[in-house]
Amino acid sequence: MMNQDNPYAMNQTCKVCGEPAAGFHFGAFTCEGCKSFFGRSYNNLSSISDCKNNGECIINKKNRTACKACRLKKCLMVGMSKSGSRYGRRSNWFKIHCLLQEQQQQAVAAMAAHHNSQQAGGGSSGGSGGGQGMPNGVKGMSGVPPPAAAAAALGMLGHPGGYPGLYAVANAGGSSRSKEELMMLGLDGSVEYGSHKHPVVASPSVSSPDSHNSDSSVEVSSVRGNPLLHLGGKSNSGGSSSGADGSHSGGGGGGGGGVTPGRPPQMRKDLSPFLPLPFPGLASMPVMPPPAFLPPSHLLFPGYHPALYSHHQGLLKPTPEQQQAAVAAAAVQHLFNSSGAGQRFAPGTSPFANHQQHHKEEDQPAPARSPSTHANNNHLLTNGGAADELTKRFYLDAVLKSQQQSPPPTTKLPPHSKQDYSISALVTPNSESGRERVKSRQNEEDDEARADGIIDGAEHDDEEEDLVVSMTPPHSPAQQEERTPAGEDPRPSPGQDNPIDLSMKTTGSSLSSKSSSPEIEPETEISSDVEKNDTDDDDEDLKVTPEEEISVRETADPEIEEDHSSTTETAKTSIENTHNNNNSISNNNNNNNNNNNSILSDSEASETIKRKLDELIEASSENGKRLRLEAPVKVATSNALDLTTKV
């Protein structure tokens, strides 16, 4: 027969006679003989005589032709109906689908019936009406089958518990039938076994086409179960394959009454839970959370963090640099105010260098910051990176010049006294110079902003600023600011405002001073190196005894009259030098350079700096100690009164 040609047909058997099914015909898997019989007899009921055996004839391959009445009855019970023929020559899947769709007639289960009725459709009509030979019996039978089909459809939809009534009806229908009827319909295995073990599938199995294996419907159905499962999974295209789908979905056990229904339902159950759960769960959980988290993650990590990191880097870097620049500005202001070196000496060189070294002495970590401070200070100063080398050279040259040339007399001891009673400040950290350093540290940022202005304005009013600073040696930056405008332009005032900042932000101020004066920047780098060497010397300088301070004062007394401002700067520088030997040398040189710069122009100072770069390096070691002593001497001279008080 045809089913031999069709591999799926081999898996499926005729629901009526048990032969291999040729395909899904009239809503059930049937062989060609039963298909043609039903087609002929359905329209010619008059030709069919009543059963002589009270309708108890067994329809099988051998005796299927013995009783037309029983054969037609079984065809109807299997679910065959003339309505199934109106689909014409269509695929088995399509026929099953359409049949189940009609039987269910429920919009809710329509789509479910389409997919599920493909498998359950064949049996849905035949399941309940098996007892009646009337063609209407098929429809009448649908009373239970539609629920069964609907249940199957729902099971496919993944709502096995959605319609318990349907399952109950299917189970009730299956269980209500006698064992014999179930055997006749093949529902005993499909309904009872399937419905009890797999209620979702059980209901479809009621109408399953396989239900009518009169001889051994259960056995056949159980054997067919696997094919049904395979067919159902593969969505059979062949006549029998669609029948398998029909049995798989419709009753899952219509064809595979015992084993098959259970398996299809399991598959259905698996599909049903997975489909609804994964889609809502996956869609909602993975889909929703990712959108929810992704925007924040992007905003936070890429958006905020990069921005924050970049901002923080920019802010943090500028902050130390700005603080250092402010410290440098304060140092410049103090230097200018104390010694008027800004006017005499290049505004960016000696004053800044002194404060840079001073701050370096106080804050040795500044050398690490120095590169960034150089960059920021370069921005502050037009010289930029190129000025670094020039600044170093100029700074060192200024230091050498200041050392070689005695600082020009400048009566500005009070400014230095407030800024640096270098030795006393070092010896007595609570001294005004220490306070000023703290203030300078506090006002590093202000000093940076003011450092540039201080450099410019300090050159003009360094002497006045020095006087003002001398008036208020250890005062808060605000006082220094007030003094600065009084003595100088408000630009130098930031430098004055940050005497504390200088002490607090020694490294930052030195770096900022580097930035404030590009020429000083290279010097600051050199001084940073010197600072490392001077760190040891700083301790020695700090260890200077009051006697040394007094002796320095005595020696510095004449110098005080000569150049209180320069000596105060030298004292500050000496404090810085005490912190750093080389820095102290460079600071003393810077103080001398401040004096020399006041005498010499900026160009001359730069030239002398270039000349004395090597000398500074050579004399750095020797001058480190001398400058330590000299710096205290200068400090004492510049701040003799304050030094005495502080000693």
Swiss-Prot record:
GO terms for molecular function: estrogen response element binding; nuclear receptor activity; zinc ion binding. Keywords: Developmental protein, DNA-binding, Metal-binding, Nucleus, Receptor, Transcription, Transcription regulation, Zinc, Zinc-finger. Residues 111-142, 196-274, 340-383, 402-600 are annotated as: Disordered. Residues 200-223, 232-247, 502-519, 580-599 have a biased composition (Low complexity). Residues 370-381, 420-432, 567-579 have a biased composition (Polar residues). Residues 520-541 have a biased composition (Acidic residues). Residues 433-443, 480-491, 542-556 have a biased composition (Basic and acidic residues). Residues 11-87 bind DNA. The keyword Metal-binding applies. Residues 120-134, 248-260 have a biased composition (Gly residues). Belongs to the nuclear hormone receptor family. NR0 subfamily. This is Knirps-related protein. It comes from Drosophila melanogaster (Fruit fly). The gene is knrl.
